[in-house]
Each structure stands twice: as structure tokens, then as C-alpha cells.
Amino acid sequence: MADQRMDISSTISDFMSPGPTDLLSSSLGTSGVDCNRKRKGSATDYQESMDTDKDDPHGRLEYAEHQGRIKNAREAHSQIEKRRRDKMNSFIDELASLVPTCNAMSRKLDKLTVLRMAVQHMKTLRGATNPYTEANYKPTFLSDDELKHLILRAADGFLFVVGCDRGKILFVSESVFKILNYSQNDLIGQSLFDYLHPKDIAKVKEQLSSSDTAPRERLIDAKTGLPVKTDITPGPSRLCSGARRSFFCRMKCNRPSVKVEDKDFASTCSKKKADRKSFCTIHSTGYLKSWPPTKMGLDEDNEPDNEGCNLSCLVAIGRLHSHVVPQPVNGEIRVKSMEYVSRHAIDGKFVFVDQRATAILAYLPQELLGTSCYEYFHQDDIGHLAECHRQVLQTREKITTNCYKFKIKDGSFITLRSRWFSFMNPWTKEVEYIVSTNTVVLANVLEGGDPTFPQLTASPHSMDSMLPSGEGGPKRTHPTVPGIPGGTRAGAGKIGRMIAEEIMEIHRIRGSSPSSCGSSPLNITSTPPPDASSPGGKKILNGGTPDIPSTGLLPGQAQETPGYPYSDSSSILGENPHIGIDMIDNDQGSSSPSNDEAAMAVIMSLLEADAGLGGPVDFSDLPWPL
């Protein structure tokens, strides 16, 4: 029985144990499955392999390392961002500590507000490349009063402080009495504009404008948009280049008045002349400065919107300006001649004057504007200058005048030499204005007979040939008009207007466009004169608009003497000394009101005939031939 059981167990064990052939087949089958799995390489197999690796201890370790690397990369990026934010916040805090407006705030400001305040503070400091405080001006061993007296003594003027908002005189030194003859108490608290010349008020208001000084540092909350009240301690005031001021103005002088009788014409003119001279030219130089209202001791309760605003004032020194008279140069030293530029209308009136004219002529630019240059020419030089005036209106070339005398403010004459050229509008082809560069001619140059400065001698073609002289004879004495210095004549300003009307009339009579007159827009010598049968030709032959020759010399002037064309018949009034503006207006038939009405009636008749509302048109009333 026992043997039987042993045989059965050995048979079962033999059956259960694989043979060599079975082992080979099983190993091949397993390797084939693995090869097929590697050969497919699909995402599903990779995921299954990863899932299989998770079950395997070695696979789980690799998966954990992979997840750890991803987590470490994320933590490193967040750390970098955190360090960047911390660094930016530290810079913002440091910037806020450097800006005074941010440092004075009680609460912490957001980044945008800090950056905006920093930009505003840098704009405030712009232009002050070398800022310095008031303390750097004064040495330590000098007091304020001593320094003030030294400055006034060196400047030979007076110190004044004027508010920029209303022009109120806040302070003036006692030395103002030496210049304006006003005491210190008379001016303090008064308006500066009450003591200025009416033509200079606008200029001084422009100089008192504080738009280009340091801007007001008014803070605005970024969240609410409302102004923020700050407790900023005012630091020492700074001066920047944009706050500098230097200008000329005329101020009243408290001179003792002279009692005159109004009935006397000469006394009345003398009074007007004295009134003109009651103003003196003051050269003011200084700075615009700002002070807090509390420091100035001003009451600001009436202005609720005045918080954070500073009071802007002009602190300047006024000095009496005296015009420069050219002195003869001794020796061979050559210096640059003094000159100024002026611009004139076609009739000779000043429309622009360079500021350098004040130092030469003693006139302020606003005194010359609107006046005719002929009012300042010497009567012996008007004939030559009138001829140059015609030439500059007829040609595009530069015209250089001879030496002539120009009346300055004190009544004396200064010798000038000018270069004129006309500016033509490129669209309308008309002369708009004349530019004149005026150079001072020194006395030693005239005495030495410099050939580059020809001088015009007295000739019959002077003031007498340009203005009516009456019927008493060809020559008469010049009347002396009270208030007008000798050497000039009353009514000389109309000469420029007459010359301009003459050139315009000739151009209108010719009826040609400016571009068809050759090289000159108003050339009257390049084309033949009109027919004498026409109204324009009769007018020219009668002496109303004489022909101007292209060549000629001044009477009594040699051939080699440099000069400009001039002829007896070229004068406006050479043949008819009694002609005037009213005579020219009466002779211009085409521009009278009656002719204008006739022309308008003909035009209306043409319109009615064209529309079928009237009969035939009668052209007999036309003021010009058809």
C-alpha cells in the first residue's frame, strides 16, 4: 500500500515538472511578448509600463525622483520672483525716502504714487544744474544790511520786490529817491503798473509771469483723485536759470512840475514835451523767487484753495539806463561797429525794432513802432533816402544808403548807414516789408574820408523838394515847431506813404502781374510807358506819377563818387510842388466813390441781363475805356 502511494506521488511530480523542451518554448514565448511590446512603443504601453513600474519598488523610486525634480523647479521659480519683488520694493522704499514729498507723508504710499512724485521732483530740479542756496551768496563776515548797501552801491540803483500776482510793490530800497525822486514810503504797497508807461505794462506783465519757474508740488492721491495735504517743511529757496529776468521799462519820475499857461501854444507844447520826459528808462535785472505765504506774513484765509501754493515775487535791481553815444576811436584798434535791425512797412513805418536800438538811439522799441522813419531823418538826407526807398520797392537787390543823420531821443543826430532789402511774399508776389540793417558810422571815419562810407552833401533834392514849399518862392526858412528839435520837418512822415502809393499806382496802371515785370515785381523802367491817350498816360504826362530813369547821378556829385540814381524828374513833387495826398486821391478817378457806384451799376445790369430780368447793358458809364 505504501509502495503504491509512492508511485502515484512520483508520477504527479514528473508530470508537474517541465522538461527541457517546455522550458525553451516558454522562454521564447516570453521574449517574444517583450519584443512585441517594445516594437509598438505606443503611449498606452508606456503608461502601462509606468503603472507596472509603480508596482515595482525600483519604478516607484524613479517616479518619486521625477516628481521631486518638478516640484523643485517650481519652488526655484517662485523664489526668483520673490527675490525680484523684494528688490523692487526695496528700491521703491529707497526712492520714497529720497523724495521730500514722499518722505513727508504719514502713511505708506503705493508704488505708482511714489514714482509720480519722483518724476515731479526731478522736473522741479531740472534746469538747476548748479543749484545754490541763499546762504552761499553772502559771506559770513557780512550782515544782511551791509551786503544790501554794498550791492546797491556797486549797482548804482535801487532794490525792489514786486509780487507776480498783482504787481504790488512789497519792498523798495531808500536809494530809489536818487533815481525816481520817490520816497520809500510812497512806493511800498502801491501797484507797480501805476508807475509804468502805458506801453510798457504788457511787457512787464509778461516778465512777471512765473510759468517757467519751479512747478507747484501739489500732491494728488492716486485712489481718490483729491489733493493730499502734506506737512512739508520749506527748505532753502533755489534759483534756476528759467527764473532769471532782465528787461527795460519806463517809470515815472517825480519831478517838480512847472506852472504854464494853457493859452500859450508854445507853453502847451513845452508841457507835452516835459510830460514825455517825466519817464526815465530803467534796466531791471533779477530773479523770480517763491516764498511760503506764512514766511511772508500774509493772510491767506480769504483764499481757501491756496494751500501748498507759494508766493512768487520778482527780486530785482533797477538801474537808470543811459544811451550809448559812439566815441571816436583813437589809434588803429578796429572794433565791431554797433548796429541794429529794423523792419518797416512799404510806407516806411516801423513794424519791428531790435533791442540793440535802445543803446544806440535811446528809444525803446515800443516808442518807434508805428512811426515813420522819415520823421527821424535829417532834412538834407531825405531826398537820397526817398530815392533808395523807391529802388528797394522796385528791385530785389540790396540797397546800401549813403551816410545820413538820424535823430536820437535827446534831439541830437547820429550818423548811420543802412542796408535795405525788400521781402516779397512768394504767393502774392507783393512786397510785404523792408528789412534795414543800420550801422553806426564813427566820427573819425567821416573825417578821414573813408571811401567805403560815402556821405551825401546838401543838395537841392532835400526836404524842400519833397514837401510843398508854398508860392512865396523856391526857398523858404524852416519854421521852428515847439517840441520838435531842429533839423527835421513837420509832416515828413507822409513821404513814405506817398512813395508807396506812387509805386502801387504805377503798378496798377500798368495792369500787369508782378511776375511779368522782369526781375522786379514793381519795375517801372523795363516796360514802355502807357499811351498818352489813356487816362493813366495823361496822368503820368501831367506829373502825377512821373517816370523814374534807370540811370542818373546826384546833382553836384562826381562820376566816381558812389551814389544811387537820382534825377530832377524822379521826385514825387519835383514838377508840381503843391501836390499832396488829397490831390492824388482826387486824381484817381477809378477809385472815387462815384466811379465805384457806376461800376457796381454796370455789374448789376450784366447780372440782370444774364438772368433775363433787364434790357441791354449801357457801357457808357464805365470809368475806364473798353
From Swiss-Prot:
Motif Nuclear export signal 1 location, chain numbering? 142-152
Q: Which region ranges are annotated with the description Disordered? A: 1-58, 459-492, 511-595
Q: Where is this cross-link: Glycyl lysine isopeptide (Lys-Gly) (interchain with G-Cter in SUMO2)?
A: 259
Q: Which GO terms describe its cellular component?
A: chromatoid body; CLOCK-BMAL transcription complex; nucleus; PML body; transcription regulator complex
| Cell compartment(s), UniProt | Nucleus; Cytoplasm; Nucleus, PML body
Quaternary assembly: Component of the circadian clock oscillator which includes the CRY1/2 proteins, CLOCK or NPAS2, BMAL1 or BMAL2, CSNK1D and/or CSNK1E, TIMELESS and the PER1/2/3 proteins. Forms a heterodimer with CLOCK. The CLOCK-BMAL1 heterodimer is required for E-box-dependent transactivation, for CLOCK nuclear translocation and degradation, and, for phosphorylation of both CLOCK and BMAL1. Part of a nuclear complex which also includes RACK1 and PRKCA; RACK1 and PRKCA are recruited to the complex in a circadian manner. Interacts with NPAS2. Interacts with EZH2. Interacts with SUMO3. Interacts with SIRT1.
Q: What is known about what this protein does?
A: Transcriptional activator which forms a core component of the circadian clock. The circadian clock, an internal time-keeping system, regulates various physiological processes through the generation of approximately 24 hour circadian rhythms in gene expression, which are translated into rhythms in metabolism and behavior. It is derived from the Latin roots 'circa' (about) and 'diem' (day) and acts as an important regulator of a wide array of physiological functions including metabolism, sleep, body temperature, blood pressure, endocrine, immune, cardiovascular, and renal function.
Q: Know the name of this protein?
A: Basic helix-loop-helix ARNT-like protein 1
Q: Tell me what gene encodes this.
A: BMAL1
